[in-house]
């Protein structure tokens, strides 16, 4: 089995479809199908900030229920899940756009989409170990020693990265560069922190190329170790991208 991993779609449905087509998938009855033995893996943060979060939710949930794709959650997925379950969350940092889309639906459609996403989230693994352990897909990454573990500390790392507890002036959390110290044998494919180009450090690759911030949506082909990207239709926001340190794909 070969895999095509996509991360941080953030409601950019049109770019998601374009990238799938570029990767060789054809959508049949709402399900992505490849002529070769390949499977799509979504690495979290399906929604928020972009224009079509509900469409992304519907598409991934339906395909996942059919067993056609794999999915692991991101921090935005976690927050949306808690919001849909009625837990108290701050409707900000992008969630407000998804909430607004949901409110535009009829009550019946809103209930259906919410239930679809809740089922998706509750049935998904925290991270995915694939290809006989040679590949791990985790939204914000994972340390080599934590692969196979599922503690609260590991969950926080996988969803939010290696946060220090400090914040940047704009409110974003300060994160350590865990990839620079990674010495594991498995390839870790992750996103979460926008970079202008896919960032390869040791056996890790960050494929969040900031589609929702006007750059690109990127897929990583494994075991080929190739990246495929499509351009974003969103306005470009240079302030959202971290400095690149490491080899660019």
UniProtKB/Swiss-Prot annotation:
The keyword Glycoprotein does not apply. Keywords: GTP-binding, Hydrolase, Nickel, Nucleotide-binding. It comes from the Bacteria. SUPFAM superfamilies: Metallo-dependent phosphatases. It is an enzyme of class 3 (hydrolase). One of its GO terms (molecular function) is phosphatase activity. Asymmetrically hydrolyzes Ap4p to yield AMP and ATP. HAMAP family: PrpE. Belongs to the PrpE family. This is Bis(5'-nucleosyl)-tetraphosphatase PrpE [asymmetrical].
């Amino acid at each position: 089995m070969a895999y095509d991993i996509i991360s941080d779609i953030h409601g950019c449905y049109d770019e998601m479809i374009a990238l799938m087509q570029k990767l060789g998938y054809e959508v049949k009855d709402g399900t992505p199908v490849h002529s070769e033995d390949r499977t799509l893996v979504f690495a979290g943060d399906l929604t928020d900030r972009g224009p079509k979060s509900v469409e992304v939710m519907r598409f991934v949930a339906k395909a996942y229920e059919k067993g056609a794709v794999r999915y692991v959650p991101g921090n935005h997925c976690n927050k949306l899940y808690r919001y849909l379950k009625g837990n108290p969350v701050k409707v900000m940092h992008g969630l407000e756009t998804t909430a607004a889309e949901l409110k535009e639906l009829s009550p019946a459609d809103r209930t259906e989409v919410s239930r679809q996403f809740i089922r998706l989230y509750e049935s998904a693994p925290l991270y995915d170990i694939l290809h006989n352990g040679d590949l791990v897909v985790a939204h914000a990454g994972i340390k080599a020693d934590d692969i196979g573990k599922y503690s609260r500390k590991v969950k926080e790392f996988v969803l939010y990265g290696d946060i220090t507890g400090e914040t940047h002036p704009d409110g974003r959390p300060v994160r350590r560069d865990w990839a620079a110290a990674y010495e594991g044998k498995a390839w870790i494919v992750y996103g979460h922190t926008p970079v202008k180009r896919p960032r390869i450090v040791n056996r890790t690759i960050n494929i969040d190329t900031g589609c929702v911030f006007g750059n690109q949506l990127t897929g990583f082909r494994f075991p080929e170790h190739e990246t495929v990207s499509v351009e974003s239709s969103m306005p470009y926001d240079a302030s959202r991208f971290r400095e690149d340190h490491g080899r660019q794909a």
